[in-house]
């Protein structure tokens, strides 16, 4: 198994631009023989999104972009960092995109709340681990 780590300059609030960078990195990673690529934390929306997370239209745009990514990236498994809204709660999440769909989503457990980090203000802490299968490996 060859794993690629996408080192991207994600721009806060530029969901469409960040999605395009994720696709470009996935194409490059696949061309180099990777079967799995991991993107940075909140790569879809940029970090730290702060008060953008309080806007429903921003979260809607992230959801739409993630769905589009899942269908656009089909030949490599990609783990994408993004905000994930569930009801009234918002999670700092990472979703696994595989075979044209979202197969799993992880919610970050340990949210920092010091110095410039204020994640507890915006996110709910997750409570479950995530294990997924990739080419028969868990």
Which residues fall in each region the model found?
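Enzyme catalytic cores with a strong preference for nitrogen-chemistry domains
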Residues: 1-138
């Amino acid at each position: 198994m060859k794993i690629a780590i996408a080192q991207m300059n994600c721009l806060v609030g530029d969901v469409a631009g960040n999605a395009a960078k994720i696709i470009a990195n996935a194409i490059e990673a696949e061309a180099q023989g990777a079967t799995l690529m991991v993107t940075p934390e909140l790569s879809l929306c940029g970090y730290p999104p702060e008060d953008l997370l309080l806007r429903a239209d921003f979260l809607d745009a992230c959801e739409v972009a993630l769905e589009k990514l899942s269908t656009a990236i089909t030949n490599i498994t990609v783990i994408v960092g993004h905000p994930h809204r569930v009801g009234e709660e918002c999670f700092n999440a990472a979703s696994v995109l595989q075979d044209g769909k979202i197969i799993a989503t992880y919610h970050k457990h340990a949210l920092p709340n010091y110095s410039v980090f204020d994640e507890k203000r915006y996110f709910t802490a997750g409570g479950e681990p995530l294990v997924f299968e990739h080419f028969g490996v868990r």
